[in-house]
């Protein structure tokens, strides 16, 4: 996100030319686009499958489980990010033949793409908050096994509302700033000129991601230490999933530090920018994959026939800690 301002009279309304970098090999860039779109679409499918299973197909199994309710909201966040930062961003960045064709149409203020940019950053913060709630949920399941369900049942609608409302405190600078298309690799993608120089969106995100990572490490450590010996095999899979997701958050923190303190408007085509996409993809595509792998019941509900699912659902216990890892 840029402090750089081109030489123009009115930054809010004057056209900003898009310079297409024609030095990139079209075939290689389109190949990058194709490879990424394949796993992005796969990620959208898997998140949608998990979401549909939890909220509709097997609602009677998961509706009383606070962890899976939170995870379904996380799937919604993943789908939103994969559509905006995945399908839209990769198309304009890597499908280079469109740059010379469309460049002239993106010189004026971009209201539609400002909404996309706002949605992307808003949902990214939501995802950090959801990570906090997910690991906190697992920890309370171990520390307060008797009252865990009632605690979360009473507070769940409030914490989910907070997940969507809190990021608004970080959206305002994009809302009042000029969004424009910046040359990125052989294509282009959105950036913005900060109206308020200190209110960097990347720094806002860094704060929330560090909080999420801290909660992840602390809550996981407490969960493992306090977990009854007889339950360790049951919860081991969940803890492994937490560690894997934590690795993704660690990489995300590193990239956010770069964007917060070292990024300049000329770096949009640097390799670091491309690698930051991969860290984001690891979280959004990897999250449902990890959960499907560690939860046999969820895996069965997603991939087995409807009749088998109905039979299995009747046999399942609805205990929060147990149903996750079976």
Swiss-Prot record:
It comes from the Eukaryota. Pfam families: Srg. GO terms for cellular component: membrane. This is Serpentine receptor class gamma-14. It is a multi-pass membrane protein. GO terms for molecular function: transmembrane signaling receptor activity. Keywords: Membrane, Transmembrane, Transmembrane helix. One of its GO terms (biological process) is sensory perception of chemical stimulus. The gene is srg-14. Belongs to the nematode receptor-like protein srg family. The lineage of its organism: Eukaryota, Metazoa, Ecdysozoa, Nematoda, Chromadorea. It is found in: Membrane. Its main location: membrane. The chain crosses the membrane at residues 36-56, 67-83, 115-135, 156-176, 204-224, 243-263, 274-294.
